[in-house]
Amino acid sequence: MSQQPSQHQERRPGIESEMRPRPQAQDPAYRGTGKLRDKVALITGGDSGIGRAVAIAFAREGANIAVVYLNEHNDAEETRRLVESEGPACLLIAGDIGDEAFCQEAVRQTVGELGRLDVLVNNAGEQHPQESIAQVSKEQLERTFRTNIFGQFFMTKAALPHLKEGSTIINTTSVTAYKGNPQLIDYAST
């Protein structure tokens, strides 16, 4: 597998459709076996990157998908198109996972429209590179923690009453948590 070249976008969140080359979100050789048939997965940050790849893979396994994303509408629509091309339904829910009320509403909408919730994937995260810790503002620090830590907590809290025995919560993390990065001090600590 080839490495993606380093790319930088000033806008946050970044827009996957503007990346060149485009990241590969699906493996054409992978064939689903129905392991998630009749299940529903809610994936935060499912509009792009790892979240999009998970949404497509889960759809290939038969799961209906709810994608929670901030405001990357075109990326989210592309994910919906890719998921629905596999057969299952794909619900798009735009909002800020750092807002507890939004997380409650996203879970309510998922259960209301897709009938249940079996898998929660806490994948959304944000990072804002800075040259030194002195450049990390209080607002940036709070925003990073609100998305990366509070968002995971709020979404899990909202989902738990709907998850039956045998359901799953998956929390993704970054290698940056283990290796560190001098330009991502706040992100690495989440």
Put a short name on every predicted segment.
Residues Q26, G32, G125-Q127, T168-T190:
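Catalytic loop of short-chain dehydrogenase/reductase
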Residues I56-A57, R108, G112, T147-S167:
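Amphipathic alpha-helical dimer-interface segment in Rossmann-like NAD(P)H-dependent oxidoreductases
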Residues A63-E78:
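Conserved glycine-rich Rossmann-like NAD(P)H-binding loop of the short-chain dehydrogenase/reductase
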Residues G34-A66:
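Canonical Rossmann dinucleotide-binding motif of NAD(H)/NADP(H)-dependent dehydrogenases/reductases
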Residues M1-R37:
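Non-catalytic terminal and boundary segments that flank Rossmann-like NAD(P)-dependent oxidoreductase
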Residues H73, A94-V107, K138:
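The beta1-alpha1 cofactor-binding region of Rossmann-like NAD(H)/NADP(H)-dependent oxidoreductases
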Residues A134-F153, I170, S189-T190:
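Catalytic Tyr-X3-Lys loop
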Residues Q3-Q4, Q104, G112, Q127-E142, ...:
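Conserved mid-core segment of classical short-chain dehydrogenase/reductases
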